[in-house]
Amino acid sequence: MDTSKNLVSHWDAAYHKDDEQLGWFESNPESTLQLINTCNLKKDASILNVGSGTTLLIDTLLGQGYTNIIANDLSEVALTKLKMRIQKKYAFELNCVPDDLTNSSKVGNLKNIDLWVDRAVLHFFLKEEEQKAYFKLIDNVMATNGFVLIAVFSLDGAEKCCGLDLQRYNLEMLQQGLGKAFKLIETFNFTYINPFGDKRPYIYTLFQKQ
């Protein structure tokens, strides 16, 4: 499963399930919100949630008054479900951008992003060229002083998710990927308990572009 087309089909199939049946479902994205609150963003700040799936994070951000939110995912099935839910619950037209972060044709056109949020996306990119493309994309779209929030499986985390192999990370690996232009603001480890009761150790990081 190493072609973009196959991966789209894989994720589309996953998101045909109910959200609560997904191994990464969070009813309360508290760890992500903890880092977002550290940023002290303006309510019209440009927030890009990559690999959003059908996340409830966007509901929470809307509830906090943020108005400029962009959702990205490889799966249009996920984005359609997310967009329809947000429209129905909040009468808000969510900007959804289907795109492959390792070979971007749309996200790369965005500029001056104030906050990049990635929970559990980067660790699916196994090839060095995919990882380099991901980090280059971040550098290209981020505003100066913009924040990058990355939460991925830590080195002692699971080796697979949703049937796919993972590249697990520590802080040094993430810093190396982002480069010296990004300063670490905060990091912590967090063990997420998924809907099936399994432990999933994560490393959460927040960087700022200098």
Task: Identify the residue ranges that each predicted region occupies.
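Conserved acidic residues
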Residues: 114
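Class I (Rossmann-like) S-adenosyl-L-methionine-dependent methyltransferase catalytic domain
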Residues: 1-111, 125-141, 146-210
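A conserved beta-strand element that flanks and buttresses the S-adenosyl-L-methionine
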Residues: 117
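Short catalytic micro-motifs in class I SAM-dependent methyltransferases
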Residues: 120-124
